[in-house]
C-alpha cells in the first residue's frame, strides 16, 4: 500500500535538499525562517561555528505591543524589518536566504521583503 507523505514531511525533505547547498559563512551568514500557525521566527546563523548571531520573532516584546495578529503577512514584514535592523546593528549587511522548505510566497516573502527594506542584501 502506498502512503501519501504529509505536507510537513514534504517540507522537511525540501529543506534538507536545500540545506545541502545553502551554507552560512562569517561573511554571509544564513537568514533562516521558521513558520508556525501562530508565529513566524527568523534567525541569522553562522554555520561554520553553529551560532545564532541575531534572532527575531512575533514573540519579541517590542513586536507584541505593536501587532494585533501574529500570524499574518503584516506581522511577518515587521519581523523582517526587526531582524534587518538588529543585523545592521551587529554589522551584518549580506546574508544567504534560507526559506526553510516553504514556498517563497505570503509570510515568507513578506519577511524577506521587510529584511531587504531594512537594508539586508540577499
UniProtKB/Swiss-Prot annotation:
<comment type="function">
    <text>This is one of the proteins that bind and probably mediate the attachment of the 5S RNA into the large ribosomal subunit, where it forms part of the central protuberance.</text>
</comment>
<dbReference type="Pfam" id="PF00861">
    <property type="entry name" value="Ribosomal_L18p"/>
</dbReference>
<dbReference type="GO" id="GO:0022625">
    <property type="term" value="C:cytosolic large ribosomal subunit"/>
</dbReference>
<keyword id="KW-0689">Ribosomal protein</keyword>
<protein>
    <recommendedName>
        <fullName>Large ribosomal subunit protein uL18</fullName>
    </recommendedName>
</protein>
<comment type="similarity">
    <text>Belongs to the universal ribosomal protein uL18 family.</text>
</comment>
<dbReference type="GO" id="GO:0003735">
    <property type="term" value="F:structural constituent of ribosome"/>
</dbReference>
<keyword id="KW-0699">rRNA-binding</keyword>
<dbReference type="GO" id="GO:0006412">
    <property type="term" value="P:translation"/>
</dbReference>
<dbReference type="GO" id="GO:0008097">
    <property type="term" value="F:5S rRNA binding"/>
</dbReference>
<comment type="subunit">
    <text>Part of the 50S ribosomal subunit; part of the 5S rRNA/L5/L18/L25 subcomplex. Contacts the 5S and 23S rRNAs.</text>
</comment>
<keyword id="KW-0687">Ribonucleoprotein</keyword>
<keyword id="KW-0694">RNA-binding</keyword>
<dbReference type="InterPro" id="IPR005484">
    <property type="entry name" value="Ribosomal_uL18_bac/euk"/>
</dbReference>
<dbReference type="InterPro" id="IPR004389">
    <property type="entry name" value="Ribosomal_uL18_bac-type"/>
</dbReference>
